[in-house]
């Protein structure tokens, strides 16, 4: 029996190959980073080069699900279907957010919509005639009490809460950077939190800020996509800080 074709059948050694293939596809997608600060949550995504005549707004990988929740996803943009997978998940999540608001009268919590997305993905791992969604997502936002949240889901339908995390092809390098550099001091202010995300992305992104897409959400404020000029300003400050640190090291060495 070909166990990699049967989505609902475990192989003798306990694998669901279609789910594992979807997880491997995510590892080839654009790198995305999420960091939870004190009063801010920041999402950063590696931006692929856009064709000269293409509208950049149609290739964004960060989107709002509701007034208090947004999401970034890692997909293989060059493979047919996977970016469309993200669109399906986003549309269903938005409908659920609207339905919850109409029924209950309050916006969803970040964990609620994360659990909904994870459950949707999980159903597609055990249904005949379907295949797993080829996307992983970082979901951020604020709860009623103003607490910032960051969650990550994968194609299998599992989800976890994080202080900082990365998905996509550069996830391993970025996660190692975050493990070394994520401290209370590193997220003391909004600007420091934004810089931490940019520094993490610069570990794997070439050509500096022009290949970075960045979004911030502050307490009681809507999602804001940073302009290329704002991102370049932060990158310039980071480069200046690096130069100053190098000079200090050279002085100590001499």
UniProtKB/Swiss-Prot annotation:
Phosphoprotein among keywords: yes
SMART domains, sorted: Proteasome_A_N
Positions of modified residues (Phosphotyrosine): 159
Glycosylation sites: 136
Key words, A-Z: Acetylation, Cytoplasm, Glycoprotein, Nucleus, Phosphoprotein, Proteasome
Tissue expression from the record: Ubiquitous.
GO biological process, one term: proteasome-mediated ubiquitin-dependent protein catabolic process
Gene Ontology terms for molecular function: identical protein binding
Domain of life where this protein originates: Eukaryota
GO CC terms of this entry: cytoplasm; nucleus; proteasome complex; proteasome core complex; proteasome core complex, alpha-subunit complex
Keyword Transmembrane helix: no
Location of the protein in the cell: Cytoplasm; Nucleus
Subunit structure: The 26S proteasome consists of a 20S proteasome core and two 19S regulatory subunits. The 20S proteasome core is a barrel-shaped complex made of 28 subunits that are arranged in four stacked rings. The two outer rings are each formed by seven alpha subunits, and the two inner rings are formed by seven beta subunits. The proteolytic activity is exerted by three beta-subunits PSMB5, PSMB6 and PSMB7. PSMA7 interacts directly with the PSMG1-PSMG2 heterodimer which promotes 20S proteasome assembly. Interacts with HIF1A. Interacts with RAB7A. Interacts with PRKN. Interacts with ABL1 and ABL2.
Family: Belongs to the peptidase T1A family.
Function of the molecule: Component of the 20S core proteasome complex involved in the proteolytic degradation of most intracellular proteins. This complex plays numerous essential roles within the cell by associating with different regulatory particles. Associated with two 19S regulatory particles, forms the 26S proteasome and thus participates in the ATP-dependent degradation of ubiquitinated proteins.
Protein name according to UniProt: Proteasome subunit alpha type-7
Gene (UniProt): Psma7
């Amino acid at each position: 029996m070909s166990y990699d074709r049967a989505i609902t059948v475990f192989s003798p050694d306990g694998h669901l190959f279609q789910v594992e293939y979807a997880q491997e596809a995510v590892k080839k997608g654009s790198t995305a980073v999420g960091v939870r600060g004190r009063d801010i949550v920041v999402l950063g995504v590696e931006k692929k080069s856009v064709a000269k005549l293409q509208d950049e707004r149609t290739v964004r990988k960060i989107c709002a699900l509701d007034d208090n929740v947004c999401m970034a996803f890692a997909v293989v943009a060059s493979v047919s279907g996977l970016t469309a997978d993200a669109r399906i998940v986003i549309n269903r999540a938005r409908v659920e957010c609207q339905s919850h608001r109409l029924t209950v009268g309050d916006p969803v919590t970040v964990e609620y919509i994360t659990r909904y997305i994870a459950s949707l993905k999980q159903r597609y791992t055990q249904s005949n005639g379907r295949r797993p969604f080829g996307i992983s997502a970082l979901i951020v936002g604020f709860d009623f009490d103003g607490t910032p949240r960051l969650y990550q889901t994968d194609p299998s339908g599992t989800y976890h809460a994080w202080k900082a995390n990365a998905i996509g092809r550069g996830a391993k390098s970025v996660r190692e950077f975050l493990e070394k550099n994520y401290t209370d001091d590193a997220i003391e202010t909004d600007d420091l939190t934004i810089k931490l995300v940019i520094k993490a992305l610069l570990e794997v992104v070439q050509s500096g800020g022009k290949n970075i897409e960045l979004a911030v959400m502050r307490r009681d404020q809507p999602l804001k996509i940073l302009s290329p000029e704002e991102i370049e300003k932060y990158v310039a400050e980071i480069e200046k800080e690096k130069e100053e640190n190098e000079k200090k090291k050279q002085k100590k060495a001499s």
